[in-house]
């Protein structure tokens, strides 16, 4: 990528900030939906973003077997090549009969769907849930809570902090 190309975040343009409180509520809503679809043998978090919703969903559903698939693609806000740094453990794979049946994969969001596609190819029969979905990634997930437009950038609470916001009207501050 050259210096002048905009990042995915800049290209998205429309900011969608999510507070801890809102995120917790959305994860609880996701848990309600998933509770009707289970039971699941184990939760698999797609790191790192999937770790937070996975903890909340596992707590709500009483699941104590938690594994990770470690995937890196975005360097801050630019998407590069997908790298699988760690797959599911043999023990979790056995629980899912080798194809992921009865396993619950969780991520914070699906955007282009690249990450979701990669995990689906690893565990085709697993249930894949994300808290937020953009249109391109939506066909990859079985369950999600809120859809946002493709030109939206979601700002998660662990990536942000409180800061001064200028008033909408110029000079009103
Ligand atoms: O649908 P996609 O276009 O593939 O994008 C979605 C993925 O991008 C983000 O992860 P990221 O690679 O930034 O890593 P992180 O979870 O460690 O922040 C997010 O947590 C999803 O896993
Ligand atoms: O914090 C993030 N917000 C997003 O909208 C997004 N899309 C891909 N990766 C992302 N990370
Ligand atoms: Mg991620």
Swiss-Prot record:
Guanine binds at residues 111, 154. The keyword Cell membrane applies. Its cofactor is Mg(2+). One of its GO terms (cellular component) is plasma membrane. It is an enzyme of class 2 (transferase). Xanthine binds at residues 111, 154. It is a peripheral membrane protein. It comes from the Bacteria. Mg(2+) binds at residue 108. GO terms for biological process: GMP salvage; purine ribonucleoside salvage; XMP salvage. It is found in: Cell inner membrane. GMP binds at residues 111-115, 153-154. It catalyses: GMP + diphosphate = guanine + 5-phospho-alpha-D-ribose 1-diphosphate; XMP + diphosphate = xanthine + 5-phospho-alpha-D-ribose 1-diphosphate; IMP + diphosphate = hypoxanthine + 5-phospho-alpha-D-ribose 1-diphosphate. Homotetramer. Purine salvage pathway enzyme that catalyzes the transfer of the ribosyl-5-phosphate group from 5-phospho-alpha-D-ribose 1-diphosphate (PRPP) to the N9 position of the 6-oxopurines guanine and xanthine to form the corresponding ribonucleotides GMP (guanosine 5'-monophosphate) and XMP (xanthosine 5'-monophosphate), with the release of PPi. To a lesser extent, also acts on hypoxanthine. Belongs to the purine/pyrimidine phosphoribosyltransferase family. XGPT subfamily. This is Xanthine-guanine phosphoribosyltransferase. It comes from Rhodopseudomonas palustris (strain ATCC BAA-98 / CGA009).
